[in-house]
């Protein structure tokens, strides 16, 4: 099995200008999106060797809520990764992969446009990762292949929870 990089965009957050950007919180809808993403990944049997999140409040909370649907061992693998706070390039975001076994999985929880740009850098494919959405890239050699792209509505359906019409 090839190494996999999974990406989870934070759930819907408070509007810009309500507080400092790094302090913006998830809305109730964003919290539901994060829980649904975690539940869907658990239902699909996806487990992670490492879970890295942006230190910004909305991304940290997304990671925590998603992980709340996983085993205790999975929850203990969460940690902040400063490059995910924004403006990174693939080498910076993927530096932590050295800690992951050759066939392992890492989950990156962060922001746009960085996550979609990362998918593009790795695969050459343009994607639109929605708030609360998930993508996965299978890495092989110097590039990768887009393996999964799920919108929040699809994640809610997989998780078996009501959708918010997104």
Language-model region placement:
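Active-site-proximal alpha-helix that buttresses catalytic centers in soluble enzyme cores
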Residues: 2-82, 88, 95, 125-129, ...
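Short, flexible active-site-adjacent loop segments at beta-strand->alpha-helix junctions, enriched
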Residues: 11-12, 57, 84, 112-113, ...
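A structural signal for short coil/turn segments at secondary-structure junctions
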Residues: 45, 70, 100-101, 141
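Short, small-residue-enriched loops and turns at beta-alpha junctions
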Residues: 86-87, 155
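Conserved strand-to-helix beginnings and helix N-cap segments that scaffold or border functional pockets
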Residues: 90-91, 119
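Non-DNA-binding regulatory cores of transcription-related proteins
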Residues: 99-133
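Domain-level recognition of soluble alpha/beta enzyme cores
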Residues: 123-158
């Amino acid at each position: 099995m090839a190494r996999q990089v999974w990406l989870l965009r934070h759930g819907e957050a408070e509007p810009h200008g309500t507080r400092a950007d790094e302090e913006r919180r998830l809305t109730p809808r964003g919290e539901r999106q994060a829980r649904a993403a975690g539940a869907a990944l658990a239902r699909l049997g996806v487990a992670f060797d490492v879970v890295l999140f942006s230190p910004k409040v909305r991304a940290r909370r997304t990671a925590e809520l998603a992980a709340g649907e996983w085993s205790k061992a999975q929850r203990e693998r969460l940690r902040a990764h400063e490059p995910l706070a924004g403006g990174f390039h693939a080498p910076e975001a993927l530096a932590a992969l050295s800690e992951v076994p050759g066939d392992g999985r890492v989950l990156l929880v962060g922001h746009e446009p960085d996550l979609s740009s990362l998918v593009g850098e790795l695969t050459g494919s343009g994607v639109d990762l929605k708030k609360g959405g998930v993508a996965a890239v299978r890495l092989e050699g110097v590039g990768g292949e887009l393996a999964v792209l799920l919108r929040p509505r699809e994640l809610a359906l997989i998780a078996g929870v009501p959708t918010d019409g997104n």
